[in-house]
């Protein structure tokens, strides 16, 4: 699993720009997921779907239904983002069980990037759904004095997203390393099962929190608009 730290270890540099293990693994995951998505859609068939296609359809249908339960009115708008987030984080969490690979989500810079992207998406989808004027009015209602508190709330939950995922994945890998150092390879299967379960749970939690934040932003503005129109 390699050694973990607050930042991924340096691998090499390109033009003075440091490339870390987490960056390399992230590139590998992105390329792999792109190839998998392309191969699935390229060979997609309505009459004779392959087992591979049925598996992906089942996974995406489950995600779609989960998002629809939270935000049915805007499911088509936010489904691509949340589903991509779920899949990427899950693969990033799981790849650490493969010898020689480093889990990008055990790197604080990666989880911070995901949290910032989620933070931006909350406002992007809110503006798409309500318009930028109505959306921004929320931060100064009922009084402009609440603006600093709204900003603090947005920043704090973004930090919480980043630190939560990073802390859980890094501690999981460190725990597995310590157990393997003490017990050797007598208990690899329980450790592997624990890693897989935790990886799935953390990906689900991060994706659901992102979904709830997006839904909360959109619905809060819709409720305010409805209340003002009454």
Swiss-Prot record:
Single GO molecular function: proton-transporting ATP synthase activity, rotational mechanism
Keywords: ATP synthesis, Cell inner membrane, Cell membrane, CF(0), Hydrogen ion transport, Ion transport, Membrane, Transmembrane, Transmembrane helix, Transport
CDD domains noted in UniProt: ATP-synt_Fo_a_6 (cd00310)
Pfam families named among the record's database cross-references: ATP-synt_A
Matching InterPro entries: ATP_syn_F0_a_bact/chloroplast, ATP_synth_F0_asu, ATP_synth_F0_asu_AS, F0_ATP_A_sf
Keyword Transmembrane helix: yes
Subunit composition and interactions: F-type ATPases have 2 components, CF(1) - the catalytic core - and CF(0) - the membrane proton channel. CF(1) has five subunits: alpha(3), beta(3), gamma(1), delta(1), epsilon(1). CF(0) has three main subunits: a(1), b(2) and c(9-12). The alpha and beta chains form an alternating ring which encloses part of the gamma chain. CF(1) is attached to CF(0) by a central stalk formed by the gamma and epsilon chains, while a peripheral stalk is formed by the delta and b chains.
Protein known as: ATP synthase subunit a
Organism: Legionella pneumophila subsp. pneumophila (strain Philadelphia 1 / ATCC 33152 / DSM 7513)
Gene name as annotated: atpB
